[in-house]
Amino acid sequence: TDEAVNAIDLLDDLDDVDKKTKNTLLKVGVDTEENNRSGSFLQVDQSNVFTNNSMSSSVEVMNMAVALDKYNWLEDYLWKVVKPDADKYTAKTALREQESGVTSGYFVRSLPGTKEVMPVQACMFIGDEAVMQTAHNVIIAEENSELHLITGCATGDDIASAMHVGVSEMYLKPGAKITFTMVHNWAEQVEVRPRTAIYQEKNSTYINNYILTSPVKSIQSYPTTYCNGENARALFQS
C-alpha cells in the first residue's frame, strides 16, 4: 500500500508500509523486509498493527494481550520490577491498562537452552499528533538461553509533538543472556519516558545499549537492574 500507516491499519506484511515510513523505521534499526531477524513487532500509537512470530523456533513474539490470554502465568511478571506507582507515567500506563482492559506492548521470550543469534525487532511508532503512547513490554530469557532485541522508536515525518511512555520489564533466568538495543528517532517536541527494569538470576548477562539519533524536548530514563544471583553481570551504554 502507498497510504501512510495510521492507528487503524493492520498489516499482512511489514513491507506494506509506505516508502517514507520504511526509511524512518530503518533509521532506528527496523528492517521492513525482515532480513536477518528472528521476529518482528510494530505498534502504531496504541495499536499493534503487525507481529511475526514464525521466524524462529527459539523465540516467541506476540502482543501482550495475546500473550496474557495464552499464558496465565504471565500475570506474575507484570509490574514486578517496575512498580505502577513509581511515578505519574507508570501510573498513567497502569491506569490505561485497567480502564481499557488491554495491555499494549510486546511479549518476547527465548526458550530454555536456545541461542538465537538473529535479533527480534520491535518498533513503537507514533503516527498521530499530540498522542500519548504507552506500552508495557515483558521480555523473558529462559534458563541458558540467549536473546537479542532491537527496539526502534520513531515518529512520522509530519508529527511535531507527542509523548512516549515505554515500560519494559525483563527477566533473565540462570545462565541467560539478553542484549537489548534501544534506538530512538523522535521529533523535537516529543517527550520520552522509558521505564526499564531488569531482574537477573545467577550467571546471567545483560547488555543495554541506548542510542538517541535526534534532539527531543525532554527525556527521562534510569534503567535499573537487580542482580539476584552469583555472577550476574550487567553493562549499560548510551
Short names for language-model regions:
Residues Y77, V81-S238:
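Conserved beta-strand/loop scaffold segments within soluble protein domains that form the structured core
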Residues T1-G101:
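Long, low-complexity, mixed-charge
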